[in-house]
A protein has these predicted regions:
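Sec-dependent N-terminal signal peptides
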Residues: 4-13
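Sec/Tat signal peptide C-region and signal peptidase I cleavage site
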Residues: 16-20
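Positively charged n-region of N-terminal signal peptides that target proteins for export
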Residues: 1-4, 150
Length: 314
């Protein structure tokens, strides 16, 4: 029973903040909470402050406009894995590419949340009936993004979201929109994204809405020399079923081959300090480079989350 409660606690955030009374009424009324779980070790290592950076394939989650800034001559493949407490895991694969001579960039991605089989319980057998059920979420998305000027880009996702709970299965469609603006001073960028627009899941007696999240943030180069760069980022987000949140992050890069990151998730019930590191290394056989990144996130009373990412360019 304790293990099941931990799983539920990891997937549903409770209310906090100045508007807690109002927010509390909304907690539990939204489904698809896994859609709020950030992907990508680089972004997580920076405390999730990534809406105004979004310059790798994980932009399909943080800000689809960022896909427009990937190299037109490269095809990007990114694999992400997240391990949460209580045997919860999230996996994602992203493929980003240019389609012929059509302006802009495209991407497709698949994501799945899995939980170890859970025991079936009833009023007479609270310790379990001896049977087990499986549960999980999955989503499949397509992204298009384009730079309209040398400073402004925009992008959009369309996602098919699926819930599997033993014999109960539901699907819904959601949309994401994002913009990026390059201020042109000190590498400063401003990013804005709306995630999970639309989408409802019909349960037996009620409908549950997918959580639409608003994100806005800014990033800038704090230090930029020939061999070193320090990137800072700030983000504000507003989920529909919890208090407003702040994210701060920083990334130090040495010659674009070694990376150290740190960040903070503020006003989160189950996430706090974050840190990470990454390396870029050559793959001689493919005549290209790859990135490997790791991030640690303190989950407070739940333990810790670990994220791993691999990115390869062709």
């Amino acid at each position: 029973m304790k293990r099941t409660l931990i799983v539920l606690g990891a997937l549903a955030l409770s209310a906090s903040g100045a508007h807690a009374a109002e927010i509390f009424e909304k907690v539990g009324t939204f489904d698809g909470q896994f859609l709020k779980i950030g992907i990508g070790a680089r972004a997580a290592g920076m405390g999730g402050a990534f809406v105004a950076i979004a310059d790798d394939p994980s932009a399909v989650y943080w800000n689809p406009a960022g896909i427009a800034h990937l190299d037109d001559e490269e095809t990007n493949v990114m694999l992400n894995h997240l391990t949460w407490p209580a045997d919860v895991s999230v996996d994602q694969a992203v493929l980003a590419f240019k389609l012929g001579k059509m302006p802009g960039q495209w991407a497709v991605n698949a994501r799945a949340l899995t939980i170890d089989d859970q025991p079936v319980r009833d009023a007479f057998r609270p310790d379990g009936t001896g049977e087990f059920f499986d549960a999980g979420y999955s989503s499949f998305g397509a992204t298009y993004a384009r730079s309209f000027t040398d400073k402004f880009s925009a992008g959009a996702n369309v996602n098919l979201v699926r819930l599997d709970l033993e014999d109960f299965k539901q699907e819904t469609i959601t949309f994401d929109l994002g913009t990026l603006y390059n201020v042109g001073v000190a590498g400063m960028k401003i990013g804005f994204a709306i995630q999970n627009i639309g989408g409802q899941v019909q349960f037996i007696e009620r409908e549950a809405r997918v959580p639409t999240v608003f994100r806005v943030g800014t990033s800038a180069d704090i230090i930029s020399t020939g061999s070193s760069r320090l990137l800072g980022s700030f983000e504000f987000s507003h989920p529909p079923d919890n208090a407003e949140r702040l994210n701060f992050g920083a990334e130090y890069a040495y010659r674009d081959y070694v990376f150290l990151r740190s960040g903070m998730n503020i006003n989160y019930d189950s996430e706090g300090f974050a840190a990470g590191a990454g390396v870029r290394f050559p793959i001689t056989a493919l005549k290209t480079n790859a990135n490997f990144d790791y991030a640690y996130t303190d989950m407070k009373t739940l333990g810790a989350a670990h994220r791993f990412s691999v990115r390869v360019r062709f």
